[in-house]
């Protein structure tokens, strides 16, 4: 299967299954091979048998979902995800893919699935990605930034991570600091965390009066973290802000903000900064490669 010869892979797997018909992994491999060779109907036949098994795992349901999507059978796919989440109620990947199905049919309930995925499986990145994209395209100006930055740190080297960095810069420019008063229109915001975030950012907003460059964003975010840990951190422990404070104490917050915003804000200025601060940037890069960023349980503050 790894060589891309799916026809032969199917033959080999079918023969292996005849000898060992109860082997779950062989059936999963057969489903994937049929899916990759675009024989979706046969893939569905195997996938349905898989998901009916008592020992079916999350991947079985994910595969079946992909086959239903390929066959453009959203109603059957919807039933499948409901069945899957009854069996695996804390599966981030299943919530993420269920939300993607709903979004593809223009059903805005997709965000409820992504939020639930973040709440029950905070270490999985896909729901942050989908939720951040959703919030970038609605009026929200908090969770697009929070979830977007969490995702960028979870997938710091991926293409999706690079695209999210561009959206983050746009979010700060076009959403968070679009109004002089950041609290405008936030009277009905149910999340105390979100209101506190905006109130704290609002007190730094005057720094944006001359425009938002990477340097200005670094100043704003530095002041935000200092004030947050003076006033709000005890009430709202949050791994993303802990990480920012860690970078600040280690003298790497400037480099982090350059990495986060610089290439999209002003590529020439970013490249010049990395050359004139070569050691500082190298230290940050080495630190970044040495750690894995994950959100812990118990830090979910969204209220819908």
What are these regions (language model features)?
Residues 2-3, 36-37, 70-71, 103-105, ...:
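Register position in tetratricopeptide repeats
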Residues 15-16, 49-50, 83-84, 116-117, ...:
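Canonical positions in the second alpha-helix
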Residues 21, 55, 89, 122, ...:
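Short coil turns that delineate tetratricopeptide repeat
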Residues 26, 60, 94, 127, ...:
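TPR alpha-solenoid repeat register
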Residues 29-32, 62-63, 97, 130, ...:
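Canonical tetratricopeptide repeat
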Residues 123-304:
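Eukaryotic alpha-helical solenoid repeat scaffolds
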């Amino acid at each position: 299967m790894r060589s891309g010869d799916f026809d032969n892979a199917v033959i080999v797997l079918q023969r292996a299954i005849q000898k060992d018909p109860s082997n779950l992994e062989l059936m999963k491999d057969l489903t994937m091979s049929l899916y990759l060779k675009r024989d979706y109907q046969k893939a569905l036949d195997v996938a349905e048998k898989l998901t009916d098994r008592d020992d079916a795992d999350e991947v079985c349901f994910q595969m079946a979902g992909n086959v239903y999507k390929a066959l453009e059978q959203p109603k059957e796919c919807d039933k499948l995800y409901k069945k899957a989440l009854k069996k695996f109620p804390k599966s981030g990947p299943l919530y993420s893919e269920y939300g993607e199905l709903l979004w593809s049919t223009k059903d805005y309930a997709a965000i409820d699935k992504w939020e639930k995925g973040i709440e029950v499986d905070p270490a999985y990145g896909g729901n942050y990605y989908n939720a951040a994209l959703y919030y970038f395209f609605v009026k929200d100006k908090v969770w697009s930034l929070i979830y977007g930055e969490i995702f960028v740190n979870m997938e710091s080297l991926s293409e999706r991570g690079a695209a999210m960095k561009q959206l983050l810069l746009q979010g700060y420019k076009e959403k968070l600091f679009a109004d002089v008063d950041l609290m405008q229109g936030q009277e009905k915001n149910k999340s105390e965390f979100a209101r506190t975030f905006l109130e704290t950012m609002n007190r730094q907003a005057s720094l944006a009066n001359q425009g938002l460059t990477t340097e200005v964003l670094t100043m704003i975010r530095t002041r935000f973290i200092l004030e947050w840990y003076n006033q709000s951190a005890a009430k709202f422990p949050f791994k993303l802000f802990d990480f920012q404070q860690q970078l600040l104490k280690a003298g790497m917050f400037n480099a982090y903000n350059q990495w986060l915003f610089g290439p999209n804000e002003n590529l020439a200025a970013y490249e010049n900064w990395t050359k004139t601060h070569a050691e500082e940037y190298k230290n940050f890069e080495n630190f970044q490669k040495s750690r894995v960023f994950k959100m812990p349980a118990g830090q979910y503050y969204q209220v819908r």
